[in-house]
Amino acid sequence: VADLAAPQPRAPRRWLLLAAALLVPLALVSLLVGAGPLPLGSLLSDPQALQVLAVSRIPRTAAVLLTGAAMAVAGVIMQLLVRNKFVEPGTTGTSEAAMLGLLAVTLMAPGAPILVKMLAAAGAALAGTGVFMLLARRIPPHQVLLIPLSGLVYGGLLMAVATFIAIEGGLLQYLGVWMSGEFSGILAGRYELLWLAGGLALLSYFAADQFTIAGLGRDVSLNLGLRYGQVLGFGIVTVSLVSSLVIVTVGMLPFIGLVVPNLVSRLMGDNLRESLPVVAAAGAGLLLVCDILGRVLRYPYEIPAGTVFGIFGAAVFLYLLLGRRAGG
């Protein structure tokens, strides 16, 4: 038995090393692909090529990696807190609430600093997530599919309110930009808030065991001595902050927090401390693939990364829902 059990601890490390090994060539491709050619040879002799790399390509690649990792981690946290594998910030009204808060502050204080806009979006996301948590508690636990469907309806209601406000305030174009989820406008000096999202994802790793226990439910958590309310609050604040930071910087990116944790869970199981680094790396890698595809499919034009991932994510979401329904 000991011989059979010995290889098990290495499995998570292998998946993490594989994910990291794939990220390196993907990041290199991302640095070289864009509206203008950037040959490797020119980087040593052409100052303009170096400037493009430093001002545009490196910030964009970093923004994609940080966003993918943070949104994937936010998704797995939300799934544990709600105890449902079919939820993420985009299916619980969190993203829509953040967008509503961003729209409100843009309407009332158009010249507000980006940090103020982020805080307004975070406050709205926090309130929106809290409302969803209250709604989810009223749904019987065995109604697994009803929770994400209710979240989609709730998010749709928030989006309808945001659209109405945008039309009345003449901000419909802004709303369209925030919904697109694209990285073409990322430059040095315009993405640095995403490092905070990455920091929150890293901080969540140190609370992985607490999140795992919280995923067992309130009563079990309290019996095990967990401060359930504090863990729940930390998780909701983390998810809300990550969602608002991403929306303020690049716009809405649906399904990352739903698809990635489910795919990793099928490969590694549900040990969050072991799987969370792989979830972050997989989220970063998948979003980077979608961003690269968006740049090359209609070159020299771009398809937003959110659109590309939305197609992939929607297909996986339907597969998971239908698979769950077929399995009873």
Which residues make up each language-model segment?
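Alpha-helical transmembrane segments in inner-membrane proteins
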Residues: A2-G328
